[in-house]
A protein has these predicted regions:
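N-terminal ligand-binding/catalytic initiation module
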Residues: 1-193, 199-201, 205-208
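Short, mixed-charge aromatic SLiMs
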Residues: 188, 217-218
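Short helix-loop-beta connector
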Residues: 211-216
Length: 218
């Protein structure tokens, strides 16, 4: 992947980690496991056209990387940020496959997004972009197939906009997006969950050294 430095780095790090295990099992080589893991199942790349509040038409690139669904439907967030490109999303989808497998839940790995930068955009502009993004993608996601969520630049508001557009187009709404707002059926305290998880993890690590969290600062 010479033109995809982020993806190349992610793949190299994982392969270095599993090299000894891989070399000890001839079945991995016979099944061409490495190449199958490194090449995503599907890559969707598309133009997203949207209109700003002044009536000017803009074009951004949209993507969805369906990396691997060996153990379940594709699952991974959607990122809106000016730095988004194919290499970054392939890297994120690749790692998402492994992260999801560690949960022991039947979920594959995916990632999507656009180089659209929501910073400085009005609520109406963000809504129109979210709707335009899903207009191009909706046929390739859905329950049992690919369940997106939020990521950088995509919170509950943006997920709600995309979820609403998907419902309108697909006329179906079960199990399509996670990370929705409570008013759209989202999970309670989901925004806090990652932060709480970090604290619980830190507490367990401190216990191994008989250290208390109280009074500690960074």
């Amino acid at each position: 992947f010479p033109n995809e430095p982020e993806y190349h780095q992610a793949v190299e790090e994982v392969l270095n980690t599993i090299e000894d295990t891989y070399n000890r099992n001839i079945e991995f080589e016979k099944s061409n496991l490495i190449e199958r893991l490194c090449i995503p199942d599907r890559i969707f790349s598309f133009r997203v056209t949207w209109t700003d509040d002044q009536g000017n038409v803009h074009t951004n690139m949209g993507y969805r990387i369906q990396h691997n669904n060996a153990i379940g439907p594709y699952k991974g967030g959607i990122r809106f940020h000016s730095s988004v490109n194919l290499s970054i999303l392939k890297f994120l989808a690749f790692e998402q496959t492994f992260k999801n497998s560690l949960t022991t839940l039947p979920m594959g790995g995916a990632k999507g997004g656009s180089d659209f930068n929501p910073k400085g955009k009005s609520n109406a502009e963000i809504m129109r972009f979210c709707q335009a993004y899903i207009l191009e993608l909706w046929r390739n996601i859905g329950p049992g197939t690919d369940i997106p969520a939020g990521d950088i630049g995509v919170g509950g508001r943006e997920v709600n906009y995309m979820y609403g557009m998907y419902k309108k187009l697909a006329r179906e709404n079960s199990g399509t997006f996670t990370g929705k707002g409570l008013e759209s059926g989202g999970s309670l305290i989901r925004p806090e969950a990652t932060g709480y998880g970090n604290v619980y993890f830190l507490l367990e690590m401190l216990k191994t050294r008989n250290i208390e969290l109280k009074g500690k600062t960074v």
